[in-house]
Amino acid sequence: MPRRRVVAAREILPDPKFSSQTIAKFMNHVMQDGKKSVAEGIVYGALERVQEKNKVDPVEFFEATLEKVRPMVEVKARRVGGATYQVPMEVRPSRRTALAMRWLVDAAAKRSEKTMALRLAGELLDAAEGKGAAIKKREDVHRMAEANKAFSHYRF
């Protein structure tokens, strides 16, 4: 148990365009070197592109896509008597969202489209269809947890 006081989580202000805390949080994941206006441009550009392609509400689309990428379980390394076991654990809700956002941004960055906004839009559209690198990452994590189910009694 830590002796220090537990720090309260900061409240994220909703984004100016859609008034969505989730999109504001996603912008923070996209942001590099504190350049929030650049991150805003990327995220809004990607959501506009998604809206053009699918003719749907971008916020609802983003929420639904994020839900498809969220992992339910993950593996954590646990040392028992000189051996390290990959122990499957359920992921808490806040971490689920954070991992999904991180995976989406990482997958988008590795794509080959010209701008980051186009890459992000492409990755969001792929994830909505159940394909793409972010979905593959989620499936890999779930597969690892399933493969190591035998060690689930080594809970933390």
Swiss-Prot record:
Keywords from the UniProt entry: Ribonucleoprotein, Ribosomal protein, RNA-binding, rRNA-binding, tRNA-binding
Subunit field text: Part of the 30S ribosomal subunit. Contacts proteins S9 and S11.
Highest taxon, organism lineage: Bacteria
Full protein name: Small ribosomal subunit protein uS7
Gene3D superfamilies in the record: Ribosomal protein S7 domain
Keyword tRNA-binding: yes
GO MF annotation list: rRNA binding; structural constituent of ribosome; tRNA binding
Pfam family, one: Ribosomal_S7
InterPro entries, per database record: Ribosomal_uS7, Ribosomal_uS7_bac/org-type, Ribosomal_uS7_CS, Ribosomal_uS7_dom, Ribosomal_uS7_dom_sf
Family from the record: Belongs to the universal ribosomal protein uS7 family.
GO annotations of cellular component type: small ribosomal subunit
Function of the protein: One of the primary rRNA binding proteins, it binds directly to 16S rRNA where it nucleates assembly of the head domain of the 30S subunit. Is located at the subunit interface close to the decoding center, probably blocks exit of the E-site tRNA.
UniProt source species: Acinetobacter baylyi (strain ATCC 33305 / BD413 / ADP1)
Keyword presence, Ribonucleoprotein: yes
